[in-house]
């Protein structure tokens, strides 16, 4: 195969040299480089077919909460497909475009993470080459012709190696075979034997449960090349968006057709370079070479399965793939974190670290040193990897990777030692304790993914107590749910008797000043100081003072000093872990810390024995602490912004914050208006954008009384008290004539804060409600969460605008009116629950309610008009007799009932039953009995008799009723209706 494809590549280069000035491949006498393949694709569509080249979107989805990562080239064009694109935007002018899109499939519906490394083809990061035609710019014939031209004439792939597939149709949904596409391929010279048809699963593409969709045609490459049975791999998928899937599952033709194509660059390059694996191409060879040069292992040889002794080649593939994903994601602003896409990225990083250290024997800092290699191979195509801007410098990416790598290496080493020590104590048939595994995991703060813990145990032939682990996971989920609001689950506490005993024993209160021992590095990262302490007292889970605790016990610890922030002042407590001095392999996860009478009680899980008098080292969870610091500084800015907006007398009535969100209660006479919410956010954004320094200093409590406008709560403060001032040094704020507290945020606060406001990033108020009269509760988020909320809000605004335009155009089609009403209803439901700016929610709710009223009014008018028209037609046909039993065309049961009512109103002596067959095969039924009918003749019984005959059901009252059924013999149903009525008259 390699020789054949190499020859094809040679013909390709010669053809380009003679007649294709829009793009040249490398002049080397070997298959083209991957970069040249990418460039040839883009140049072909730009120069030969007039496509506009657009940059790759960020791998972080913009305004699309349904995705963790961008996983296809079409993601950034969703607004066009959905009709929600801003008409004033650049995208609205797109007609034919092409690009190479960065894609990540490592979470959610499309997840290739676990397969990476095990075979020769899967990747978490890949490049998707694509071309698009919007609004019918071109369609099937042109798309197929362009694809065939590129593959056979530009890339020089032999035509007899290419197979194509098309949609075979689906009788259940009424979709015809895509014979047009079949005939196009035949006209291009593809033999009928290589034109295959498949059904919905293979050749019908859908964006989701609802939305644009359509048949697709795939181009496959035959790896066998005539040497035995075909071995087909998909090269290119061409989607023809011509339908729209409604919420009820029905399909309708789109008013405008679109072309959406996608071809994986890595697989295409493998074909053109004559390789059986994407990892054998020059897209990966520089990385594989760099890995080999840094590690004491044999060079990569492409083995899989049992042939891959020691899993060395698997590790090569894992590391090469994952470092590409990490570099691209971090450059696009997605860093390893604790939830959502950042959590997935953290798992990818730690998976790469484990394979690099345990299998490849890589030195410290190994992964970070690979980042420049990634930039060298991808930087020309994606300049954001090289730009000198925020968070995208090569050294910043490498530094971030290296820091997390170093932290995880330390965690892995501790984890291995803990596993080894625990396994030695197990009997032959004992299960590995779930509590110990949990303490090693991400949830237990050591940060080793549970699947890696299980893998390490499997290597030792030890089984994990999965049932116990599931119970712990359920408890953790419940615990997190309860912590979403201020109240955490009740934990250990020191009652008055315990405190009295501590004082009697002369045990001093806890020195927690080390919690403020942190600094800001020049690169913008925070460094938290180490804290060493002594265990002064231990408590069992029941609260009893004990001299020691054993393995697997939940306990409380009192130390002489701590760097953990104990929950107070509305700020959630720190999390983290402690280790015994001199025994670095034993980790004690600390779930929370709380202050009781000056004593800081740490709640921890003991993986093994701990005694009073032991010396320990404490480590706070940096990500959790940073999240709290961001939210706390943001809370102060929010308080200041509220005073700026509502007046200097505005009072705070409470707050609570954790890394996920903040809650703020404020005294207000009336709920905040939409404009006030918007103004509050703008004040905070201004302060954040100015990146003001945050000054913190302890001063005598008496001195704070002379600060005009000081923000303080009605509570007892320590003396001296800590003053937190934004933008103004504390000494200046304390000056007698200072007006600082009237112009910026100055508060008494013992919490932990940022050292400058810029790290808040952004603040969005996502909810407000009246707790009681005069007190409003605000919910807010910051940073990337806030930015995403704004993007979702903007996307929602565009959808509302589209709905408004549809309503303004009007329609005589009742089904379309009902669809629009349902669409507006769905927007109303989404607006209620979506995480978007609250001011925007209020605006859109007002607009949508108005649109819903207009839509319902339009429906009622259409139904009344149709009912009047239908009833008049029926009266002409049934002017005499006691009965009207007939069929009529009605688009809904509501219309049918209105027709019956109007008939009975105009002919009160007649009893009426109407049937209306529907396109779906169902039959609607409505009836009303005449005034003065016999008592035994009821509408409900009449409808039930007819609908039962049709295998359906009915409901209603003695006077009027309705129902549904299914039948192919309407005349028989009508005869049943007449016979029943005549028998009752």
Swiss-Prot record:
Write out the annotated subcellular location: Mitochondrion
One Pfam match, given by its short name, reads: tRNA-synt_2c
Task: Using the UniProt record, name the top-level EC class of this enzyme in a single word.
Answer: ligase
Keyword Endoplasmic reticulum part of the UniProt annotation: no
Q: What is known of its domains?
A: Consists of three domains; the N-terminal catalytic domain, the editing domain and the C-terminal C-Ala domain. The editing domain removes incorrectly charged amino acids, while the C-Ala domain, along with tRNA(Ala), serves as a bridge to cooperatively bring together the editing and aminoacylation centers thus stimulating deacylation of misacylated tRNAs.
Tell me the residue numbers annotated for binding Zn(2+): 632, 636, 749, 753
Per its UniProt entry, which superkingdom is the organism in? Eukaryota
Q: What is its EC number?
A: 6.1.1.7, 6.-.-.-
Q: How does it assemble?
A: Monomer.
- For binding ATP, which residues are annotated in this chain's numbering? 105, 123, 205, 235-237, 264
Provide the species name. Answer: Rattus norvegicus (Rat)
Family according to the record: Belongs to the class-II aminoacyl-tRNA synthetase family.
Record-linked PANTHER family: ALANINE--TRNA LIGASE, MITOCHONDRIAL, ALANYL-TRNA SYNTHETASE
List, in alphabetical order, the Gene Ontology terms for molecular function in this entry: alanine-tRNA ligase activity; aminoacyl-tRNA deacylase activity; ATP binding; peptide lactyltransferase (ATP-dependent) activity; tRNA binding; zinc ion binding
Relay the cofactor remark from the entry.
Binds 1 zinc ion per subunit.
HAMAP family tied to this protein? Ala_tRNA_synth_B
Q: What is this protein called?
A: Alanine--tRNA ligase, mitochondrial
Q: Which residues form the signal peptide?
A: none
Q: Does the keyword rRNA-binding apply?
A: no
Tell me which residues form the transit peptide.
Answer: 1-23
Per the annotation, which location comes first and is thus the protein's main one?
mitochondrion
- What GO biological process term is on the record, naming one? alanyl-tRNA aminoacylation
Recorded hits in InterPro entries, A to Z, give: aa-tRNA-synth_II/BPL/LPL, Ala-tRNA-lgiase_IIc, Ala-tRNA-ligase_IIc_anticod-bd, Ala-tRNA-synth_IIc_core, Ala-tRNA-synth_IIc_N, Ala-tRNA_ligase, Ala_tRNA_ligase_euk/bac, Thr/Ala-tRNA-synth_IIc_edit
Biological role stated in the UniProt entry: Catalyzes the attachment of alanine to tRNA(Ala) in a two-step reaction: alanine is first activated by ATP to form Ala-AMP and then transferred to the acceptor end of tRNA(Ala). Also edits incorrectly charged tRNA(Ala) via its editing domain. In presence of high levels of lactate, also acts as a protein lactyltransferase that mediates lactylation of lysine residues in target proteins, such as CGAS. Acts as an inhibitor of cGAS/STING signaling by catalyzing lactylation of CGAS, preventing the formation of liquid-like droplets in which CGAS is activated.
What positions does the entry give for L-alanine binding?
A: 237, 260
């Amino acid at each position: 195969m390699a020789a054949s494809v190499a020859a094809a590549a040679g013909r390709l280069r010669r053809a380009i040299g003679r007649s294709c000035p829009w793009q040249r491949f490398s002049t080397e006498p070997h298959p083209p480089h991957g970069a040249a393949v990418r460039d040839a694709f883009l140049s072909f569509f730009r120069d030969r077919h007039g496509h506009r080249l657009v940059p790759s979107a960020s791998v972080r989805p913009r305004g699309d909460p349904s995705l963790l990562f961008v996983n296809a080239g079409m993601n950034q064009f969703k607004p066009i497909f959905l009709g929600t694109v801003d008409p004033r935007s650049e995208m609205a002018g797109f007609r034919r475009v092409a690009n190479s899109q960065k894609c990540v499939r490592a979470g959610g519906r499309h997840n290739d993470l676990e397969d990476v490394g095990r075979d020769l083809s899967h990747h978490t990061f890949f490049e998707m080459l694509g071309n698009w035609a919007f609004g019918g710019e071109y369609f099937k014939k042109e798309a197929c012709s362009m694809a065939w031209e590129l593959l056979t004439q530009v890339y020089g792939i032999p035509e007899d190696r290419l197979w194509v597939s098309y949609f075979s149709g689906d009788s259940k949904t009424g979709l015809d075979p895509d014979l047009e596409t079949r005939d196009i391929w035949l006209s291009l010279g593809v033999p009928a034997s290589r034109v295959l048809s498949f059904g919905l699963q293979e050749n019908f593409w859908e964006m989701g449960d609802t939305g644009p969709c359509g048949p697709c045609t795939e181009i496959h490459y035959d790896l066998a090349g005539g040497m035995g049975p075909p071995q087909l791999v998909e090269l290119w998928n061409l989607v023809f968006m011509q339908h729209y899937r409604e919420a009820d599952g029905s399909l309708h033709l789109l008013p405008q057709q679109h072309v959406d194509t996608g071809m994986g660059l890595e697989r295409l390059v493998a074909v053109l370079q004559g390789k059986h694996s994407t990892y054998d191409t020059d897209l990966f060879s520089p990385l594989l070479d760099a890995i080999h040069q840094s590690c004491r292992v044999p060079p990569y040889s492409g083995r899989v399965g049992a042939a891959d002794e020691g899993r060395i080649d698997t590790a090569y593939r894992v590391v090469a793939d994952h470092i590409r994903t990490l570099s691209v994601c971090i450059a696009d602003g997605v860093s390893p974190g604790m939830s959502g896409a950042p959590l997935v990225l953290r798992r990818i990083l730690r998976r790469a670290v484990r394979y690099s250290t345990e299998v490849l024997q890589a030195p410290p800092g190994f992964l970070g040193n690979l980042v420049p290699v990634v930039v060298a191979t991808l930087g020309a195509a994606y300049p954001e990897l090289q730009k000198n801007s925020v968070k995208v410098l090569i050294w910043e990416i490498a530094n971030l990777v290296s820091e997390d790598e170093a932290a995880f290496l330390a965690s892995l080493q501790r984890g291995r030692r803990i596993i080894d020590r625990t396994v030695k104590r197990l009997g032959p048939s004992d299960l590995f304790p779930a509590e110990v595994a949990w303490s090693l995991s991400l949830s237990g703060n050591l940060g080793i993914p549970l699947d890696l813990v299980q893998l390490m145990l499997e290597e030792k032939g030890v089984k994990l107590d999965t049932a116990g682990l599931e119970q712990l996971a359920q408890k953790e989920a419940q615990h997190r749910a309860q912590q979403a609001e201020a109240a955490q689950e009740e934990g250990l506490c020191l009652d008055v008797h315990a405190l009295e005993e501590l004082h009697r024993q002369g045990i001093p209160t806890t020195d927690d000043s080390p919690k403020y021992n942190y600094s800001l590095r020049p690169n913008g990262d925070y460094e938290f100081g180490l804290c060493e302490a002594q265990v002064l007292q231990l408590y069992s889970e029941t609260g009893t003072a004990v001299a020691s605790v054993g393995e697997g016990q939940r306990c409380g610890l009192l130390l002489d000093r701590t760097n953990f922030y104990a929950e107070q002042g509305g700020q959630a407590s720190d999390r983290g872990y402690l280790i015994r001095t001199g025994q670095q392999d034993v980790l004690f996860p600390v779930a929370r810390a709380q202050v009781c009478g000056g004593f800081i009680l740490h709640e921890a899980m003991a993986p093994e024995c701990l005694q009073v008098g032991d010396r320990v080292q404490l480590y706070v969870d940096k990500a959790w602490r940073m999240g709290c610091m961001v939210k706390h500084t943001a809370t102060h800015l929010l308080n200041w912004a509220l005073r700026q907006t509502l007046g200097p007398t505005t009072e705070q009535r409470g707050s609570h914050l954790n890394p996920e969100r903040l809650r703020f209660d404020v005294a207000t006479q009336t709920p905040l208006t939409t404009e006030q919410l918007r103004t509050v956010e703008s004040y905070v954004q201004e302060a954040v954008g100015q990146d003001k320094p945050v000054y913190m200093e302890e001063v005598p409590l008496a001195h704070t009384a002379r600060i005009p406008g000081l923000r303080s709560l009605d509570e007892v403060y320590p003396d001296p008290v800590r003053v937190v001032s934004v933008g103004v040094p504390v000494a200046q704020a304390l000056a007698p004539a200072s007006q600082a507290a009237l112009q910026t945020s100055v508060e008494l606060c013992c919490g932990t804060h940022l050292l400058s406001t810029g790290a808040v990033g952004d603040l969005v108020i996502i909810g407000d409600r009246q707790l009681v009269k005069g007190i409003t509760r605000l919910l807010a988020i910051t940073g990337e969460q806030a930015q995403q909320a704004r993007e979702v809000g903007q996307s929602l605004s565009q959808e509302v605008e589209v709905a408004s335009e549809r309503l303004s155009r009007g329609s005589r089609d009742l089904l379309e009116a009902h669809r629009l009403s349902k669409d507006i209803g769905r927007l109303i439901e989404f607006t209620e629950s979506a995480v978007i700016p609250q001011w925007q929610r209020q605006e859109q709710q007002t607009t949508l309610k108005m649109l819903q009223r207009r839509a319902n009014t339009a429906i009622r008018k259409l139904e009344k008009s149709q009912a009047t028209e239908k009833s008049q037609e029926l009266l002409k046909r049934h002017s005499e007799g006691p009965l009207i039993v007939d069929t009529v065309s009605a688009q809904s049961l509501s219309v049918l009932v209105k027709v019956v009512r109007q008939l009975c109103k105009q002919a009160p002596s007649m009893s009426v039953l109407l049937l209306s067959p529907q396109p779906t095969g169902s039959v609607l039924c409505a009836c009303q009995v005449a005034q003065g009918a016999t008592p035994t003749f009821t509408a409900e019984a009449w409808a039930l008799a007819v609908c039962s005959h049709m295998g359906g059901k009915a409901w209603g009252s003695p006077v009027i009723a309705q129902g549904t059924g299914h039948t192919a013999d309407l005349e028989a149903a009508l005869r049943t209706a007449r016979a029943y009525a005549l028998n009752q008259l």
